[in-house]
Amino acid sequence: MAQRTRLGDILRPLNSEYGKVVPGWGTTPVMGVFMALFLVFLLIILQIYNSSLILEGFSVDWAG
């Protein structure tokens, strides 16, 4: 028999919804927000790599 934990009791309602499809948009807007934030993060990393984003006191030397 499985042991009950507080974390398991907290997560159980999420697991009970497994396989069910909620009508409408659901959490799609939240996913869109996180995708946009991830895109901004990638753009910042690309600009640092490309040296087009200049950070004071931070030198990027890729030669090793």
Curated annotation (Swiss-Prot):
SUPFAM superfamilies: Photosystem II 10 kDa phosphoprotein PsbH. Keywords: Membrane, Photosynthesis, Photosystem II, Thylakoid, Transmembrane, Transmembrane helix. Disruption phenotype: Reduced growth under photoautotrophic conditions and increased photosensitivity; approximately normal amounts of PSII accumulate but electron flow from QA to QB is impaired. Increased photodamage to D1, which is degraded slower. HliB no longer associates with PSII complexes. Psb34 no longer associates with PSII complexes. Phosphorylated in vitro in the presence or absence of light; phosphorylation is inhibited by oxidizing conditions, DCMU and zinc ions. The chain crosses the membrane at residues 28-50. It is found in: Cellular thylakoid membrane. It is a single-pass membrane protein. One of its GO terms (cellular component) is plasma membrane-derived thylakoid photosystem II. GO terms for biological process: photosynthesis; protein stabilization. GO terms for molecular function: phosphate ion binding. Pfam families: PsbH. Induction: A monocistronic transcript that is strongly expressed. It comes from the Bacteria. One of the components of the core complex of photosystem II (PSII), required for its stability and/or assembly. May regulate electron transport between the quinone binding sites of the reaction center. PSII is a light-driven water:plastoquinone oxidoreductase that uses light energy to abstract electrons from H(2)O, generating O(2) and a proton gradient subsequently used for ATP formation. It consists of a core antenna complex that captures photons, and an electron transfer chain that converts photonic excitation into a charge separation. PANTHER family: PHOTOSYSTEM II REACTION CENTER PROTEIN H. Belongs to the PsbH family. PSII is composed of 1 copy each of membrane proteins PsbA, PsbB, PsbC, PsbD, PsbE, PsbF, PsbH, PsbI, PsbJ, PsbK, PsbL, PsbM, PsbT, PsbX, PsbY, PsbZ, Psb30/Ycf12, peripheral proteins PsbO, CyanoQ (PsbQ), PsbU, PsbV and a large number of cofactors. It forms dimeric complexes. This is Photosystem II reaction center protein H. It comes from Synechocystis sp. (strain ATCC 27184 / PCC 6803 / Kazusa). The lineage of its organism: Bacteria, Bacillati, Cyanobacteriota, Cyanophyceae, Synechococcales.
